Regions:
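Membrane-proximal intracellular helices of multi-pass ion channels
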Residues: 1-495
Length: 495
């Protein structure tokens, strides 16, 4: 029994190794549940009981899978990595939803799975109408799911699997990583994972310290730090960040949302004092330029429509909204819907684009937009000068035709999924603008609320079928669509 699914010479999917690693992931998830359990005990809340029960069950099942599914063949191929990446996020959400079902403010199975998937994918959409009624333990668990999902479940687990072959680690890394290029930041993926999570943790601790200097308690500082650096957007208050009425808090969150939207490869370069390389990066400069461009347009709309109410209304408030939307964080600091139809239209576009690849953000990624713009310029130049010898380069690296085709295919499927989600909600009787905004939010892992979702971004109005569809769209968006879609191809399952 110990060497279940051991087929060293087989070309079939290595189910034994997949279950072995999945068992380790479940043990990691069980360990994370200790934090909200401790929080419940500190605040004298009864929700420590479901956390203790669920953590124990998750640990036992994970340990059993890790022990019995321990194959001789430890090689992971590309198909294995893609399957494991998809299954891991679903399994994490299935066990992660149990605290929401067994707590003092229970959700049904549709709502609980939606909430867990929204957390782990850092979407930030919620079905909880009044989060302030939840226990501190549940609020901590919501925030923690986003912190875990920020860099990725697979990436975190790779820090604890030293025995996994490097090619297998690379397959898992690519299956979960985002963008048109995947940089290996270290010789071994396990070392890369430790480096990234170490940096992620340091930034989180720094953010907690800075938030504690403002008008916000330690518990809320920890929760918002988890959901800010992960660009997730869950809050401990129904009105979100607006409840604090603090320019300082908004400024700190803008700074770290911006950092969360930057490729961690660039952050490591900055850490190593390679600032010149950071500034020369095409995508980083376009990221800055995009924020500046949208800031000018949003401020112009605010002034034109007479919504100027003081210096905050034309400085930190529009900047907060832009960075929140572009980085797919989804924090709300006020009623931005009142700024006019232009701002709503720009918000759609910002949600679509997203920030940099290799960051914690959702969306199509600025990297792809940079490639499309450069490719468009190249095509126009070739049309004028047919014999022109040139290539499409991003950050000094040539993007070959195969990568270009992948970008085009991704944009097409990404847009199709948004349309599909919008049509599903329209068919269920929701207004067309609200339906497509909600679909945008889920596919781009954004979570911003507007229209029927309101400032709280609550999706409790959705019927059960709508919640399951939106949950699937969140997962597709987090795994950059292609990884999930390939599982439905018959050729994927052939040896």
């Amino acid at each position: 029994m110990k060497y279940l699914f051991a087929h060293p010479q087989s070309n079939a999917i290595n189910l034994g190794m997949i279950m072995h690693i999945l068992g380790q992931m479940m043990m990691v998830e069980a360990a994370f549940m200790i934090l909200p359990l401790v929080v419940c005990l500190l605040y004298g809340e009864e929700d420590w009981k479901p956390f203790a029960l669920i953590a124990s069950i998750t640990l036992v099942i994970g340990a059993a899978m890790n022990y019995f599914a321990n194959p001789h063949n430890r090689l992971l191929r590309r198909r294995d990595g893609m399957l494991l990446a998809s299954v891991a996020w679903i399994v994490f959400s299935l066990f992660g939803m149990l605290p929401f079902m067994l707590c003092q403010t229970p959700l049904n199975v549709h709502e609980a799975f939606f909430e867990a998937m929204s957390g782990f994918t850092t979407t930030g959409a919620t079905v909880i109408r009044d989060v302030e009624q939840c226990s501190h333990g549940i609020l901590m668990w919501r925030s923690l799911t986003q912190w875990i999902g920020g860099l990725g479940i697979i990436l975190f687990t790779l820090t604890f699997i030293p025995a996994l072959n490097n090619s297998g680690s690379l397959m898992l890394f690519h299956a979960e990583a985002t963008g048109i290029t995947h940089e290996k930041l270290a010789a071994r993926i396990s070392h890369t994972a430790k480096l990234l999570w170490g940096l992620y943790t340091v930034l989180t601790i720094l953010l907690i310290a800075l938030l504690c200097c403002g008008p916000i308690g330690v518990f809320e500082s920890v929760c918002h730090a988890f959901t800010c650096i992960s660009t997730g957007g869950f809050s401990t208050h129904n009105l979100g960040i607006a409840v604090y009425h603090s320019p300082y808090i908004k400024f700190i969150l803008v700074l770290f949302m911006f950092i969360g939207g930057v490729s961690f490869g660039l952050i490591i370069l900055a850490y190593r004092n390679s600032w010149r390389e950071v500034w020369r990066n095409d995508v980083f400069r376009f990221y800055l330029g995009t924020i500046a461009f949208f800031y000018v347009l949003v401020v112009a709309s605010i002034v034109y429509r007479g919504h100027y109410t003081g210096w905050e209304s034309v400085t930190i408030d529009p900047l907060f909204h832009i960075v929140s939307a572009l980085t797919s964080t989804g924090f709300s600091a006020g009623n931005w819907e009142g700024w006019g139809i232009l701002v709503l239209t720009l918000t759609f576009f910002m949600m679509y684009v997203g920030a940099c690849a290799g960051s914690t953000t959702g969306g199509a990624k600025i990297d792809r937009l940079v490639y499309l713009l450069k490719n468009f310029t190249f095509v126009v130049r070739r049309y004028v000068r047919p014999r022109l010898l040139a290539s499409v380069d991003v950050n000094g690296q040539h993007v070959n035709a195969e990568r270009g085709s992948e970008v085009s295919a991704f944009i097409f499927i990404y847009t199709t999924l948004i349309v599909f989600g919008g049509v599903v909600l329209v068919a269920q009787g929701f207004p067309i603008v609200d339906a497509f905004f909600s679909s945008f939010s889920c596919v781009s892992n954004n979570g911003l609320g507007a229209g029927i979702t309101g400032i709280t971004g609550s999706y409790d109005f959705l019927p059960a079928s709508g919640k399951w569809v939106m949950s699937l769209l969140m997962l597709a968006g987090r795994l950059e669509i292609i990884t999930l879609i390939t599982l439905f191809l018959p050729s994927f399952w052939r040896s």
